[in-house]
């Protein structure tokens, strides 16, 4: 009877170690200033979505009697999917960062409409990391440097 219980405990222990979680941490900076960071623990192969946005309302059209109001979504959206393979951790991820640069107003007939101008950063790729390794992805455009940093650790 004791042997049976030890076999059951050993089976559960093996299952628990096979289902170890992976801790993923990300950070996005622009010219050295932190724009956003995200951290999660998840199981092997499980996608974790990420969303840190604000809605900015703006006048998008209409007529004199009725103005059409729309929402501009600014901030960060994305997801991470870690996979373990031997001693490595493969992480598939995407990130989309949008910021409002300015919102000029223009007269259109008898109404005023807003014209949001945005900028941002977009990255989608898969990276192979060793346990605990940190990787940086740099992008330089028009004097603006974005750095996206990602790391993954088996728990």
Regions found by a protein language model. Name each.
Residues 1-4:
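Positively charged n-region of N-terminal signal peptides that target proteins for export
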Residues 13-15:
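N-terminal signal peptide c-region/cleavage motif recognized by signal peptidases
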Residues 18-155:
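Outer membrane pore-forming secretion/assembly proteins and partners of Gram-negative envelopes
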């Amino acid at each position: 009877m004791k042997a049976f219980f030890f076999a059951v405990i050993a089976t559960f222990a093996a299952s628990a170690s096979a289902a170890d979680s992976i801790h993923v941490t990300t950070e996005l900076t622009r010219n050295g200033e932190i724009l956003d960071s995200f951290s999660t623990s998840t199981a092997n192969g499980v996608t974790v979505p990420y969303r840190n946005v604000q809605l900015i309302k703006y006048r998008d059209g209409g007529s004199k009697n009725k103005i059409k109001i729309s929402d501009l979504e600014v901030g960060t959206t994305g997801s991470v999917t870690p996979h373990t393979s031997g001693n490595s951790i493969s992480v598939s991820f995407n990130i989309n960062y949008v910021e409002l640069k300015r919102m000029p107003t223009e007269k259109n007939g008898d109404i005023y409409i807003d014209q949001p101008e945005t900028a941002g950063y977009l990255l989608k790729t898969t990276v192979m990391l060793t346990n605990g390794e940190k990787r940086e992805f740099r992008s330089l455009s028009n004097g603006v440097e974005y750095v996206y940093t990602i790391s993954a650790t088996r728990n």
